[in-house]
Amino acid sequence: MKIIRGFAQAEKRLSRRDKAGFFLDETERTELARRLGVDPEKAVNGIIADVRKQGDEAVLGYTLKFDRANLSKLEVGQPEIQQAASEIPAELFEALQLAASQIRAYHRFQKEAVWKTAEIMQGKQLIRPLERVGLYVPGGKAFYPSTVLMTAIPAREAGVKEIILVTPPGANGKIPAPTLAAAQIAGVDRIFACGGAQAVAALAFGTKSIPKVDKICGPGNIFVTLAKKAVFGVVDIDGLQGPSEVLIVADQYANAEYCASDILAQAEHDALASSILITTSEDLANRVNDIVESKADTCSRRDIIKQSLRDNGLIAVVDNINEAIKLANMYAAEHLCLLVKDSEKYLTQINHAGCIFYGEKASVVMGDYVAGPSHALPTSGTARFSSPLNILDFVKYIDIVKVDKQDIAKLGQAAATIAKAEGLECHAEAVLKRLE
């Protein structure tokens, strides 16, 4: 990993000012354009148009083209879903159940807090869950049951009436059993074997098989992200997720092995993942770098890890923790680890992060699977203005206005005066009539 020294150098390297198109990595975009013969955004817009026009036929056609799965129907039957639990190792099923209980407890606690606020606002505001949401879970060659739990359980706890899940099938046309088992545990209502931009379009506009939803949540590749961007406004979305990232703030007391293991775990995601260590200790920087370089060769995904660390890995040595915290706030990482002495006292200084992990046992991996908060987090600096997926993503508020005689007497003339000033005479008249 590259090691740099000094706040100014670190600030320059960690600046995101030139990363406005974070989910459109130029290398990836150029390669995709070469392979497709068209810009990815144009390709996605074409897929969306086809799905709007041809419905299920287009979704099935693109599933055959991109996933090599020749399906006659898109929906996964309930017998197949119910059987999935018996097809996975008991240890995995129990682990998924434990993770689900943690996620459920966390979001139930949040729900209670949200509903208490609603009680305080009684008579002024209503809170209502969304009717139907669509969850996108990556699939195909890999499977991610954890993402099923992390997106579906917050929706279920919020009171969403119907949860639809889409995920790409394998070439055999099947959804992996762990994904189906997780969906059953989380309370997903319906599952469809499709992915990519075609699945997002189907959720946004509806087809004969796939119902139109109110909101689409979940991470995906560049095509999924561009499709979510394109349909926003027709439906709501949770955000535009880019490559995963971790930023570790560490002092001389930090465990170098722990720092290195979290860096390797992050780099293991994909070649675009970012792994950053900011430390006040030159000695720790060198030890972590040595461990990472020696262990990278022993990992099964060594090629991905090496490319990720080469392109997006960084160690910065700064003078003090205050400088490190300032850099962390500037970067607004998806995952922020505080591996420093008395780490809890620095929580109040953190303004921008998707999720904060503090205490030396708090590996990001715990947040990925079992800690409780959703692992669907803002990336690429969007933690400056957006939040992790949670209960509030699946509810909406309706304001209430009640006006009695005292209210109209007190406020009516002011409303009419403002309306007249804006040239809206009928507005003014609607109020003045009530003052008669």
UniProtKB/Swiss-Prot annotation:
One of its GO terms (molecular function) is NAD binding. Binds 1 zinc ion per subunit. NAD(+) binds at residues 136, 198, 221. Pfam families: Histidinol_dh (PF00815). Pathway: Amino-acid biosynthesis; L-histidine biosynthesis; L-histidine from 5-phospho-alpha-D-ribose 1-diphosphate: step 9/9. Gene3D superfamilies: 1.20.5.1300, Nitrogenase molybdenum iron protein domain. Keywords: Amino-acid biosynthesis, Histidine biosynthesis, Metal-binding, NAD, Oxidoreductase, Zinc. InterPro entries: Ald_DH/histidinol_DH (IPR016161), Histidinol_DH_CS (IPR001692), Histidinol_DH_monofunct (IPR022695), Hstdl_DH (IPR012131). GO terms for biological process: L-histidine biosynthetic process. SUPFAM superfamilies: ALDH-like. GO terms for cellular component: cytosol. Zn(2+) binds at residues 266, 269, 368, 427. Its cofactor is Zn(2+). Substrate binds at residues 244, 266, 269, 335, 368, 422, 427. It is an enzyme of class 1 (oxidoreductase). The keyword Nucleotide-binding does not apply. Its EC number is 1.1.1.23. It catalyses: L-histidinol + 2 NAD(+) + H2O = L-histidine + 2 NADH + 3 H(+). Belongs to the histidinol dehydrogenase family. This is Histidinol dehydrogenase.
